[in-house]
């Protein structure tokens, strides 16, 4: 005879087995939001195109997977940026147009900036204004500027400058000495304002892929 206790344990196991997927789904973020997770600021934005699923992991870890996306930006870091040294490690596996970068904003002036460590099949520098180079953390980076006209920003729809450093030797782990880039930008008249958030971002545009990154 099967005991009641055996049936109870089996029933609990079955409930747990069915509960786990829903618990996982609760941790998946698919709509634009910002917040704090395990001591780190996180930001996820999507224009709603395709399928994009973002997950906050332990400490500074996050993962994101996307399929035929429209446009999205995601990542973990700090609510207030600075000239800190940023460590990152993990995997970045895009199919199409995607970026892995230190990403942030400043105000007064309003600036969106990228220190790009890796990218998919498109180097965005092709459509920007080349300003020079900086050598940092084992590679040469090409410096670019680009003006965004009437585009979304942390201050609403606005016209603002983008500053870019694009690494010539791609990587998915290492240390980014942000001060080297900020100083190089300033030497070309590319000045930052008061820092808003600063993250290690995975960004995709009309592409598919996955990324799992830990920030510290």
Curated annotation (Swiss-Prot):
- Highest rank taxon of the organism: Eukaryota
Q: What is its main location?
A: secreted
Q: Return the Pfam families for the record.
A: Glyco_hydro_11
State the compartments where it is located: Secreted
Keyword list (alphabetical) reads:
Carbohydrate metabolism, Glycosidase, Hydrolase, Polysaccharide degradation, Secreted, Signal, Virulence, Xylan degradation
Q: What is its EC number?
A: 3.2.1.8
Protein's name in the database: Ethylene-inducing xylanase
Give the source species.
Answer: Penicillium digitatum (strain Pd1 / CECT 20795)
The gene it comes from is EIX
């Amino acid at each position: 005879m099967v005991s009641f206790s055996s049936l109870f344990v089996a029933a609990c196991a079955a409930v747990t087995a069915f509960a786990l997927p829903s618990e996982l789904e609760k941790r998946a973020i698919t709509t634009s939001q910002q917040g704090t997770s395990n001591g780190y600021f996180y930001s996820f934005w999507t224009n709603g195109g395709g399928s994009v699923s973002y997950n906050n992991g332990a400490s500074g870890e996050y993962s994101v997977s996307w399929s035929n996306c429209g446009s999205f930006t995601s990542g973990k870091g700090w609510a207030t940026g600075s000239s800190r040294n940023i460590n990152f490690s993990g995997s970045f596996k895009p199919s199409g147009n995607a970026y892995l970068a230190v990403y942030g904003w400043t105000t007064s002036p309003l600036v969106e900036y990228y220190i790009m460590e890796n990218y998919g099949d498109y180097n965005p520098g092709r459509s920007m204004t080349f300003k020079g180079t900086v050598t940092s953390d084992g590679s040469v980076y090409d410096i670019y500027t680009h003006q965004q006209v009437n585009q979304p920003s942390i201050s609403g729809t606005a016209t603002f400058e983008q500053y870019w450093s694009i690494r010539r030797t791609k990587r998915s782990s290492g240390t980014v000495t942000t001060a080297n880039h900020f100083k190089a930008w300033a030497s070309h008249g590319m000045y930052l304002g008061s820092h808003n958030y600063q993250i290690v971002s995975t960004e995709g545009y009309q592409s598919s892929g996955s990324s799992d990154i830990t920030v510290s």
